[in-house]
Amino acid sequence: MSDSHLTAFDKASKAGFIIALGIVYGDIGTSPLYTMQSLVENQGGVNQVSESFILGSISLIIWTLTLITTIKYVLIALKADNHHEGGIFSLFTLVRKMSPWLIIPAMIGGATLLSDGALTPAVTVTSAIEGLKAVPGLSHIYQNQTNVIITTLVILIVLFGIQRFGTGFIGKIFGPVMFIWFSFLGVSGFFNTLGHLEIFKAINPYYALHLLFSPENHRGIFILGSIFLATTGAEALYSDLGHVGRGNIYVSWPFVKMCIVLSYCGQAAWILANKHSGIELNPFFASVPSQLTVYVVILATLAAIIASQALISGSFTLVSEAMRLKIFPLFRVTYPGANLGQLYIPVINWILFAVTSCTVLYFRTSAHMEAAYGLAITITMLMTTILLNYYLIKEGVKPFLAHLVMTFFALVEFIFFWASAVKFMHGGYVVVILALAIVFVMFIWHAGTRIVFKYVKSLNLNDYKEQIKQLRDDVCFDLYQTNVVYLSNRMQDYMIDRSILYSILDKRPKRARVYWFVNVQVTDEPYTAKYKVDMMGTDYMVRVELYLGFRMPQAVPRYLRTIVHDLMESGRLPKQEQEYTITPGRDVGDFRFVLIEERVSNARQLSNFERFIMQTKASIKHVTASPMRWFGLQYSEVTLEVVPLILSDVLKLPIKELVPVEDSEA
């Protein structure tokens, strides 16, 4: 990696600062909408809070943001970039060679992050719309929670509906809107604290520790389940590293943290001033002057939509990375935007929409959603901590020191997990069930791939080179295609899937001028696009190894076109002049891609567990994208062949012929 790239990645700019606000901080920036509300409601309402409770709550929020968001994610995790990319799967690719079991925390962390992404839009948008209850002219309408639900669902329908068209056209306003949002949080919070400057004593961690063990705290340590809502967006700082660069996060985070802390302090000051008023509104909206409430609700709704959009886009990226790492089924991916970073996965989009909408309908109020929110993300953070521990060791940190630092964060996060676990019975089971379903699918897909690799038969291409040459020159067979391309999942040295040679020589001899054997390898680097070619001492057999980053589309025909021209220009591959063509001077012949689907033909060697995995994976395949779409072959000539995947050496099954007995009287 060049120094210039590192400098650009670590450099901050005014434009990068604004972009970071719109992309990175949507989730954590909308947490003031519901965190204080959750704390107050779980304490029994505004009338039940005391000054020490409020000081302790704010102190817990400040130090949670400091320990988890600032120290763990901003100061440590952002260093663990994979060629400028962040996120749990990027981190996994950095350390996966250190231990095979690291795939487990990667899958669990990815699954819980996805399940959290389904709940975030429901919580943030509902919280924003509930602010209309504080608007004098609209309060009589939105006191009816059904109207809140309808408005929320309309916004979600529009939000998920526009994903197929790309969001680049509205993405340009995200940064400026979030800058206004954070500025409002900071300014309004500051003015609310002017009458209660004692609230700033909360910076002293004594108040945080005192509250955890104080009898005034009705929930004890379980109050941390509500406190954790303030930092649920911390994982997004790391996941969106590649979009904005480390330097812009370093510069923007202090501004964001200051604004949201001031907002929490402002809400706390309002609670202290109105704890005997009997008002039971969300402290965030109640602390705003009534004449400004409608504008604040509009701004909060925009911020909630931006936060939701960031989670949706992040979910698409997460799933696409999992697919390329071969731990998730293949689904159709499109790129509606002008760059590869803007992707859209229809199946995931509508699953997220269904789960989010059902969440709104099931929980109805943001308060009930908050009761379930945060449980999954504590697990994600724990999994990230495990992977970070290995990363620090890989980077030369002494194992004792790495274990010490990461054990500290693991203990802190486990306490938050324990405190959030009580949410399981109050709706947390929804995200847990969703996360378990995703982990199950990931496990089946990964384990099924390993089983195939374990049993598949491979043959050496060199042993069949002479047969292929004879077939190529045998005019008794019609020319099947000028170029025949086989995509192989396994191609080590000259060993290749038995099924490919079976297709060429046995199933139907395929005479061609050139045989291509292509293997796509996903690299640890996100945006690699390289290849290696081996002509095998011939001009008719070509082994191609494509090295594509885990964030690159696997559009094989486009890459192959470039490779063919490179080989012809270097003289390694003869030109293929076409007698009939509408393109003058065309020197590349026609291509046919042969896709082979291996089906288990004899499962005697499989255990019951392995058989269950293979059968389940086959069922999942029915709803996944075809390999033709995944490899970008929908506009190419493609043949799909089904061949037996032989898992047993038993080639003949005994069978006895029934010989008719002649009539003795005949």
Swiss-Prot record:
User: A GO molecular function for this record?
Assistant: potassium ion transmembrane transporter activity
One family from Pfam that matches here is K_trans_C
Q: Which residue spans traverse the membrane?
A: 16-36, 58-78, 100-120, 141-161, 165-185, 221-241, 253-273, 292-312, 343-363, 373-393, 399-419, 424-444
Q: Which UniProt keywords apply?
A: Cell membrane, Ion transport, Membrane, Potassium, Potassium transport, Symport, Transmembrane, Transmembrane helix, Transport
Q: Which cysteines are joined by disulfide bonds?
A: none
Can you name this protein? Probable potassium transport system protein Kup
Tell me the gene name.
kup
Give the UniProt family note. Belongs to the HAK/KUP transporter (TC 2.A.72) family.
